[in-house]
C-alpha cells in the first residue's frame, strides 16, 4: 500500500478518538478490510506526527496512544468532502426507472456494437415471423419490423405490463408488430410458428433459463434460428490497485445483483440441452475508458453501496474505491456472448 494511503487510513482510524498502535490497526481493518504491516503503520504515524497532523499522548503502561491534531482533523474532513464531491459528480446513486435505464443503455457504444452482431446473426428476412423474447420497451422491434417487411410479422413478448404498454405506444404505427404480455417460460404461441427469435440480456434475469430455451425451441420451426446475447458478469474487471476490492465488487454483482450472473458461459450448453445445434459463439468484450460511460451500464455507486450493505466491501474501502475510479484514469471490461442456435428437425 502506498504511504499516502497508509497515512489516510491512520487519520480515518483516529477520527473517533485516541488509539494506540494495535488498536489503530484494528480500526483500519474494520473499515478497510486490511491491516497495515508494522513498518507501514509506524512509518505513517511518524510522518503524520512530523506534519503535525497527529500527536502522541501520555503513555499508558507500554502503550502510546495518538490523537488527531486540529490540523489533522481539518485535513481529514477536507479530503472526505473533496472526494465525495468528485465521485458524486461522476457517478449516479439514484436507481433509474427500468424504462429509462434500458433506453439509456441502448444508446451506449457497447450496446450498439453487440446489437449489430445479433441482428446480423439473426438474419431475419422479408416475410418471416420474428420473435423478441423479453422485448422491454420495444427498443429493437422497429429494426426487426424493417428486416421482415413488407409481408412478415414481429411479435414482442414481455412479462412487465409497463414494458408492454411502452412497446405498444412506440410501435403503434408499425402494423407488422404485435406486443403481448406473456411469460418466457410458457409462451402463448403455437408449436413451430416462428421463423427466428432473439433474446437480449433477458436470460440473466429469468427464473429458469433452461425452461425458457425449451419454450423457444418449441415455438421455432425446424431449422429456425435463435440468437441470444448475454453477459458473463464473472468476467467483469475493473482496474484498481487493490485487486481484492475489485474482485469483491465483481463477486457481489455475480452473487447478488444478477440472478444468473454467469449465464453467458452457460448459453451454448443450455441450448444444446434444449435441442438446438449451436454453430456459432461470438464473444464481445466491451471496454470502458470513461467512468461516467461505464456507470451508465454498471451502476457503480449504487451497486457499491449494495456491496457494503451485503458485507462484500468495507465502508471505507468502498469510498476509496469510488474516489479512485472517479479520479481516473479509468478502465473496466466485461464480456458478452452472442450465441447462435438452430432448431434441429
UniProtKB/Swiss-Prot annotation:
UniProt keywords, alphabetically: Methyltransferase, Transferase, Transposable element
Coiled-coil intervals: none
Molecular functions per Gene Ontology: methyltransferase activity
Gene3D superfamilies cross-referenced by the UniProt entry: Vaccinia Virus protein VP39 (3.40.50.150), Winged helix-like DNA-binding domain superfamily/Winged helix DNA-binding domain (1.10.10.10)
Cystine pairs: none
InterPro entries reported in the protein's UniProt record: Methyltranfer_dom, Methyltransf_Superfamily, SAM-dependent_MTases_sf, Tscrpt_reg_PadR_N, WH-like_DNA-bd_sf, WH_DNA-bd_sf
Superkingdom of this protein's organism: Bacteria
GO biological-process terms attached to the record: methylation
Family: Belongs to the methyltransferase superfamily.
Protein name: Uncharacterized 37.1 kDa protein in transposon TN4556
Organism: Streptomyces fradiae (Streptomyces roseoflavus)
Amino acid at each position: 500500500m502506498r504511504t499516502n494511503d497508509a497515512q489516510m487510513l491512520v487519520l480515518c482510524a483516529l477520527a473517533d478518538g485516541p488509539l494506540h498502535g494495535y488498536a489503530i490497526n484494528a480500526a483500519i481493518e474494520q473499515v478497510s478490510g486490511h491491516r497495515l504491516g508494522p513498518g507501514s503503520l509506524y512509518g505513517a504515524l511518524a510522518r503524520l506526527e512530523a506534519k503535525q497532523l497527529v500527536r502522541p499522548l501520555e503513555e499508558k503502561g507500554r502503550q502510546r496512544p495518538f490523537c488527531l491534531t486540529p490540523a489533522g482533523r481539518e485535513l481529514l474532513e477536507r479530503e472526505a468532502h473533496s472526494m465525495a464531491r468528485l465521485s458524486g459528480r461522476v457517478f449516479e446513486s439514484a436507481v433509474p426507472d427500468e424504462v429509462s435505464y434500458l433506453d439509456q443503455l441502448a444508446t451506449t457504444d457497447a450496446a450498439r456494437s453487440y446489437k449489430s452482431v445479433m441482428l446480423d446473426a439473426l438474419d431475419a428476412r422479408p416475410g418471416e415471423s420474428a420473435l423478441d423474447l423479453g422485448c422491454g420497451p420495444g427498443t429493437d422491434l422497429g429494426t426487426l419490423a424493417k428486416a421482415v417487411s413488407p409481408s412478415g410479422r414481429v411479435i414482442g413478448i414481455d412479462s412487465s405490463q409497463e414494458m408492454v404498454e411502452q412497446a405498444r405506444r412506440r410501435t403503434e404505427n408499425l402494423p407488422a408488430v404485435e406486443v403481448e404480455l406473456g411469460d418466457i417460460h410458457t409462451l402463448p404461441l403455437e408449436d413451430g410458428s416462428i421463423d427466428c427469435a432473439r433474446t437480449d440480456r433477458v436470460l440473466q434475469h429469468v427464473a429458469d433459463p433452461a425452461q425458457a430455451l425449451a419454450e423457444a425451441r418449441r415455438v421455432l420451426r425446424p431449422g429456425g434460428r435463435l440468437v441470444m446475447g448475454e453477459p458473463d458478469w464473472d468476467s467483469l474487471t475493473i482496474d484498481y490497485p487493490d485487486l481484492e476490492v475489485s474482485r469483491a465488487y465483481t463477486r457481489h454483482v455475480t452473487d447478488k445483483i444478477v440472478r444468473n450472473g454467469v449465464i453467458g458461459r452457460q448459453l451454448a450448453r443450455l441450448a444444446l440441452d434444449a435441442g438446438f445445434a449451436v454453430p456459432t459463439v461470438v464473444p464481445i468484450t466491451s471496454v470502458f475508458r470513461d467512468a461516467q460511460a461505464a456507470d451508465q451500464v454498471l451502476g457503480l455507486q449504487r451497486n457499491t453501496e449494495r456491496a457494503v450493505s451485503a458485507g462484500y466491501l468495507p465502508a471505507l474501502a468502498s469510498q476509496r474505491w469510488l474516489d479512485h475510479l472517479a479520479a481516473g484514469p479509468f478502465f473496466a471490461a466485461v464480456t458478452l456472448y452472442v450465441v447462435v442456435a438452430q432448431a434441429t428437425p
